A protein has these predicted regions:
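Phosphate-binding site of ATP-dependent enzymes
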Residues: 109-200
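Short catalytic/ligand-binding loop motif for oxyanion handling, primarily in non-cytosolic enzymes
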Residues: 40-42, 64-65, 90-94, 151-154, ...
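A long amphipathic alpha-helix within ATP-dependent nucleotide-binding catalytic cores
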Residues: 146, 170-221, 225, 229, ...
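Conserved N-proximal alpha/beta basic substrate-recognition cap immediately N-terminal to
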Residues: 1-102
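Generic beta-strand structural signal
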Residues: 77-82, 139-141, 158, 162-163, 208, 214
């Protein structure tokens, strides 16, 4: 998504430089921390002080154990359904690719992708006692209360995308409790709950996407992403990304 937003900045006359790795960073008025890892490595953190402004400079850990307010332990008294997820963003695929690259003693070549099995779909269990011991014993998994948004029209999921003060918040419908992009339909713009703005402040986000639901009038944040993807540009998305790009202005003051 940021690539599409940056195209608007360039059209406005801003110079945008994309830098890979943690060395040879140019001087800049604003730096955007855009590293697709759940936890930002120390070598990146050390370099941030050289810039006067760092977008997402405080959003250093987006693991489920940091983001979620619905984590469970095996001895909790929760009696409802639960869902098992990876603690790492996107099932830790990027971390596994990085580990492959290091084990091969070379970076991945342009266009080369390490074979990493996609993470299994979130698993829903009727109760805590149905969760296998292997999950509780794993540091890579978390167990959360399963709190879907559901009404007579089916299930819903909401996404709040923001850059500074520019934002859009959309709700999609779906027939399944675990909402997938291919099954999302009937998008509609909805207000951003104040509780979600508080979560953004807690997590230190300036730019990103929050996936959430409203369950029994309660806002439930289940994913926070500082490197969101985007569908192929269309007329409506181009306009939306141009609106998002306006959020840069507050960081240039």
């Amino acid at each position: 998504m940021l690539r599409h937003v940056a195209a608007t900045w360039e059209a406005q006359g801003h110079r945008v430089v994309v830098v890979a790795g943690s060395q040879d960073w140019p001087d800049a008025d604003v730096a955007i921390l855009h590293v697709d890892l759940t936890v930002i490595p120390e070598e990146y953190r050390r370099g941030l002080n050289r810039f006067p402004v760092v977008v997402n400079g405080a959003a250093l850990d987006i693991s489920k154990r940091v983001v979620s307010r619905n984590l469970l332990n095996r001895d909790d008294a929760w009696t409802g359904a639960v869902v098992v997820k990876s603690n790492l963003n996107d099932g830790g695929v990027t971390e596994q690719q990085l580990a492959y690259s290091k084990s091969a003693h070379r970076p991945l070549l342009p266009g080369e992708v390490a074979y990493v099995p996609r993470p299994a779909t979130y698993e829903i269990f009727p109760s805590i006692r149905d969760v296998p011991d292997s999950v509780w014993e794993s540091n890579s998994s978390v167990v959360e209360r399963f709190l879907p948004e559901h009404d007579a029209s089916g299930y819903s999921v909401r996404a709040w995308i923001f850059f500074g003060k520019s934002e859009r918040c959309t709700r999609w419908r779906c027939d399944e409790p675990i909402v997938k992009a291919t099954g999302m339909r009937d998008p509609e713009l909805v207000p951003v709950p104040e509780e979600l703005r508080a979560e953004r402040r807690r997590l230190g986000f300036d730019y990103g996407k929050f996936d959430f639901v409203v369950h029994d009038d309660r806002v439930v944040l289940f994913d926070a992403n500082r490197t969101p993807g985007a569908p192929p540009p269309r007329n409506n998305t181009v306009a939306a990304n141009a609106h998002l790009a306006a959020g840069l202005d507050e960081f240039l003051k």
